[in-house]
Amino acid sequence: MVQYAVTLKGGDWTVFRDGEPIEHGMSRSAAIQMAKGLAFEAEEHGDTVELLIQGYYGEMSRRLSGGAED
């Protein structure tokens, strides 16, 4: 399983892969677009993907590959 996350860190939106930052200083929409693209590529290679996206008020949405959502 691979995990991608978009969170607000130090005032910047950051994209993480498996807990490690891979890109920062982005707008929220650009970070989400990047994370979704990376998640799609991972799914294409047969990986199970967890995508976590932080909202503006700190709430987290979670999506697992296959369209499951909490």
Each PLM stretch: what is its role?
Residues 1, 30, 42, 69-70:
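Short, solvent-exposed secondary-structure boundary motifs
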Residues 2-21:
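Short aromatic-glycine-(Arg/Gly/Cys) micro-motifs in beta-strand/loop hairpins
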Residues 6, 15, 32-34, 51-53:
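Generic hydrophobic secondary-structure signal
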Residues 12-15, 28, 57:
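Compositionally biased, intrinsically disordered low-complexity regions
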Residues 20-24, 31, 68:
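Short, surface-exposed beta-strand-loop junctions and turns on beta-sheet-rich folds
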Residues 24-25, 63:
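Short capping micro-motif at the N-terminus of alpha-helices
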Residues 26-48:
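A short, charged, amphipathic alpha-helix used as a generic interaction element across diverse proteins
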Residues 44-70:
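Short, mixed-charge low-complexity intrinsically disordered segments
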